């Protein structure tokens, strides 16, 4: 009986141990599953905060919610161990980090959009530049009317003057015929006759060259050569009178400037090989750019004027006026172009203005243009500065102090040279904190009349300075 009691006691103890072990194992499994679920819950709650759902206004509610879940591991347990003030500081820092990240993301997105727009603009400018070069090449290759097409498959209709003779610039185009008006036989006949005429003309040129050599020897020793020299001197006087008249018209009214432009344009065929004529024609194109109101006409005048100034520079690099007006037309053309083209024109503008000042340092116009360039560069936008740095090795750099020195130099060389120049001086002094000097130059600017369009445009700036500086 005692043996059975002992056996029953041992079995009861063994059962108690097994039950205790099973209970502990079951509790471990439950705790492990609950810990994993809590970890997943913590990650799902922290994810929205990284995606712009954090709100500082609900900080107290979030702290209460974390405290209301007892026994959970993770951030809630960590925060619950901190005092109320410490929890608020941690949440404030997290909100600040998230807000900074969101602001950074918006800035990156804005920069990406700007770069995409800039890339599209550059591609468009390159395409338009290539198309313009192709048009110029076609104009140079086909200076006369193009030959009519022999294609009969196209339904296009080309129009050409039917007067028979070649039209000049002064003539007007008369009646029109279609491209397929002539028969194939007539075109073949015309080509054969043209070939025959070419052969005859070649023989004529050869004979003419031989005769001209003999004639030159005779003319050189004849009394008529003295008369030819007199004609050359009279022709030189004529061109000098023409250039003097163009200078006087340039200094006159708007109508005078238009007359000067037409005068030079009409005489381009006769004197277009002279450098002093070409830069004056470029100057006249600059005047027309200022006078016209239509944007397309402004760009056309500026482009043609830049080409004339470039042709003048090809005649020689020692002409200060050619460099000066090339720079002016670069600036006028840049007003109708994109940001990258404007920055490139800015480099070219500075280069030619510096060259003009080097060749003619006593001319106030060069110093005025340099001062205006420095002032505009000192006020470039952030995007323009970054674009210049990205596209060019040496970015544009200038200060308001640089601009002031150039404007003062122009005023020193010729007092009262420009009303706009005095307004610029006043603006520079104001930005440098010298209001008394700014007020002085503002009063001096009011004494000058409006001569150029730039002077008139600065009237509004002058009035604003009056309000800021007072009288």
From Swiss-Prot:
The modification Phosphoserine is found at residues 44, 46, 50, 57, 183, 193, 212, 233. The keyword Repeat does not apply. Residues 1-12 are mitochondrial intermembrane. Residues 36-471 are cytoplasmic. The chain crosses the membrane at residues 13-35. A motif (FFAT) lies at residues 157-163. Residues 191-201 have a biased composition (Acidic residues). Phosphorylation at Thr-160 of the FFAT motif activates interaction with MOSPD2, VAPA and VAPB. One of its GO terms (cellular component) is mitotic spindle pole. GO terms for molecular function: microtubule binding. Keywords: Apoptosis, Coiled coil, Cytoplasm, Cytoskeleton, Differentiation, Membrane, Microtubule, Mitochondrion, Mitochondrion outer membrane, Nucleus, Phosphoprotein, Transmembrane, Transmembrane helix. It comes from the Eukaryota. It is found in: Mitochondrion outer membrane; Cytoplasm; Nucleus; Cytoplasm, Cytoskeleton, Spindle. PANTHER family: REGULATOR OF MICROTUBULE DYNAMICS PROTEIN, REGULATOR OF MICROTUBULE DYNAMICS PROTEIN 3. The transmembrane region is required for mitochondrial localization. The FFAT motif is required for interaction with MOSPD2. The FFAT motif is involved in the interaction with VAPA and VAPB and its phosphorylation regulates these interactions. Belongs to the RMDN family. This is Regulator of microtubule dynamics protein 3.
């Amino acid at each position: 009986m005692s043996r059975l009691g002992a056996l029953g006691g041992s079995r009861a103890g063994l059962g108690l141990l097994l039950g205790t072990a099973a209970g502990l194992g079951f509790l471990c499994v439950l705790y492990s599953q609950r810990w994993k679920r809590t970890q997943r819950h913590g990650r799902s709650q922290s994810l929205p905060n990284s995606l712009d759902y954090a709100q500082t206004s609900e900080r107290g509610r979030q702290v209460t919610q974390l405290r209301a879940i007892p026994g959970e591991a993770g951030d809630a347990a960590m925060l619950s161990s901190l005092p109320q003030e410490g929890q608020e500081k941690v949440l404030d820092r997290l909100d600040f980090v998230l807000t900074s990240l969101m602001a950074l993301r918006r800035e990156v997105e804005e920069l990406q959009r700007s770069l995409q727009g800039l890339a599209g603009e550059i591609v468009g400018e390159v395409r338009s530049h290539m198309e313009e070069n192709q048009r110029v090449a076609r104009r140079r290759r086909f200076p006369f009317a193009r030959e009519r097409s022999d294609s009969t498959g196209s339904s296009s209709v080309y129009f050409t003057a039917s007067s028979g003779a070649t039209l000049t610039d002064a003539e007007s185009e008369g009646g029109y015929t279609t491209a397929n008006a002539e028969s194939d036989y007539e075109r073949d006949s015309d080509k054969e006759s043209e070939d025959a005429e070419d052969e005859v003309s070649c023989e004529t040129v050869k004979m003419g060259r031989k005769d001209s050599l003999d004639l030159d020897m005779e003319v050189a020793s004849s009394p008529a050569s003295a008369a030819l020299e007199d004609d050359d001197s009279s022709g030189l006087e004529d061109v000098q009178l023409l250039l003097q008249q163009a200078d006087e018209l340039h200094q006159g009214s708007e109508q005078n400037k238009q007359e000067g432009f037409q005068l030079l344009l009409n005489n381009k065929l006769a004197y277009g090989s002279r450098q002093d004529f070409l830069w004056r024609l470029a100057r006249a194109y600059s005047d027309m750019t200022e006078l016209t109101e239509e944007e397309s006409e402004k760009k056309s005048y500026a482009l043609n004027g830049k080409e004339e100034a470039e042709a003048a520079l090809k005649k020689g690099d020692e002409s200060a006026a050619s460099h000066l007006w090339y720079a002016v037309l670069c600036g006028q053309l840049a007003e109708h172009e994109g940001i990258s083209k404007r920055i490139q024109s800015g480099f070219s503008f500075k280069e030619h203005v510096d060259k003009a000042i080097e060749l003619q340092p006593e001319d106030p116009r060069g110093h005025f243009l340099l001062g205006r360039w420095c002032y505009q560069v000192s006020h470039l936008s952030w995007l323009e500065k970054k674009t210049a740095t990205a596209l060019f090795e040496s970015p544009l750099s200038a200060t308001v102090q640089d601009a002031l020195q150039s404007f003062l130099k122009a005023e020193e060389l010729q007092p009262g040279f420009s009303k706009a120049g005095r307004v610029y001086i006043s603006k520079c002094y104001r930005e440098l904190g010298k209001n008394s000097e700014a007020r002085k130059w503002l009063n001096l600017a009011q004494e000058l009349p409006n001569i150029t369009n730039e002077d008139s445009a600065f009237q509004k700036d002058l009035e604003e300075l009056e309000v800021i500086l007072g009288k």
